[in-house]
């Protein structure tokens, strides 16, 4: 690409054909576009002057002065203007006017970086798309960067595995993370720092963690990152639901092998994303299950409240979703879309433009979930409110039911950490409390604080007080049947 741009400018200079065309570099990764621009300018023996479009004067007189000064400097110092328009707001008419004037009046060499094609300028513009690197290109970048990393490790070069194992490790990184060349370099640099401080250093783990960190900045601004230390042991579910979650995990881990190595993607490129629905009442473990998957897969988990993404303005919901998915793709994070009911209502007859656009919003979300190179999860408290036509496009649908007495007893047994002091807890009696796991965890935590404040181990009386507080918060009545025998001395065996 850099060679093509350089040849284009060279041909224009050789022909003395007047004002050179503006070069547009369109794509998601600003640093890759900057790298290309710098290579072009080096080949063309020009220096680069970078400028954010937001630094442009908005006053007409100031802008005219800026243009005159730039024209003089670009000629005297043989400079190319590299204009960063990646975060240009198309609705900012004042800035758009200044930008248009600059591009039309400056006669020298200009390169624009942008996410979407720039239009409406009365001057020739040639667009070059800068997509994210293909997996093979990413693999080459990884190999080159790891070779540099090995040189930096000095006496720790033994941390770099043999060629065959290293190739497998890098293929795993390429399959999970869609990083640009510059992000791969940064990940390797960060991994060196980790390896020098770890007591049991592992190059694979250091690179994996660095990749997760590289992808966070953009997504942290758009969604809530949930930290999770949960494991399969923290889940109490019926066997069928447990098996479904394990299948989801397998689909994420083996995605590259099945689609690329085994060739299933060649049959059909559609629907390669892993889209799931977790349905069930509040507190039944939907978010907890997502946390378990994230921890087991060593991936970040981001929670997005769909109610806050949906906009009353036509087209804005899709833009909000686009920003989230675009930011998430490089890191392969697990996306948890909460409150699916707010957008996935049953499809009704299209009577007006609002109905039509509402269906478009749903279709757009499903399309992005299906093409997302990772796991995207929807949650709902009421599956019956969702249109079956939409559900058919999801790969997994898992029901999270209210736990029965046996499952509640298991939850009570696991809810207290091994280091928490307890005394005389009757788990079968506690299981009489007809409440979901989320509320059980709240009660256990509150009981621990009550016991700690009293200087005692957690006992049934503390759990009773915590239960009364929890039920009052929920506006529920605590029946005598549910707490029967809780504070009877005969319970303490």
Predicted regions and their residues:
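Conserved phosphotransfer microenvironments
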Residues: 89-99
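Short acidic/histidine-rich motifs immediately flanking catalytic phosphotransfer sites
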Residues: 77-80
